Amino acid sequence: IAEENYSVLKPTAVIFNLGVNDPGNMYDYISYYQEIAESLQKKNCKLFFMSVNPVNSKTIEYLGKNAIRKEVIRKFNSVVGSALGSTFEYIDTYSYLMENGYGTNISGTGVDMPDDDGLHYTTKTYKRIFKYCLDYLILH
């Protein structure tokens, strides 16, 4: 019965986004997304995969932590984006942020903090990512 209630005319956009914590499991993510895609498409969902976004490696390393390299993020985005390409549309926020800049701070809660962890974005950057995705959805 629930299947009958989904709109035939206007699909629901579903955007998947992963963080930078787990690049070693990219093939597990691909399998999982491929596994759930058919079920979501039956519910008239249009599927999108948003890129893993850049980090400020210099800040992370300055804090004495291991930073994921931009090359690893680009490879992850390329492999996952290509594997899902026939079912998911790819929203390349990574390139957008690299071209237009981004800010990081320690918060990640929507309230900016004076400290920076190089990983979480400023409120302004999160809003820019959100707007970029909305603009992408309007065009696609």
Region roles according to the model:
Residues N5-Y6, S39, V79-A83:
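An active-site-proximal structural segment forming one wall of the substrate-binding cleft
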Residues S7-K10, K42, R128:
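Extracellular/periplasmic catalytic domains that process cell-envelope and extracellular macromolecules
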Residues V55-H140:
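Catalytic His-Asp segment of secreted/periplasmic serine-dependent ester chemistry enzymes
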Residues D28-E35, I73:
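Charged helix-capping and loop-helix junction motifs
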Residues I1-E3, Q34-E35, N77-S78:
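A generic local structural motif
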Residues I15-N21, A37-R74:
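Active-site segments of SGNH/GDSL-like serine hydrolases
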Residues I1-S31, N53-S57:
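Oxyanion-hole/transition-state-stabilizing segment in secreted/luminal serine hydrolases
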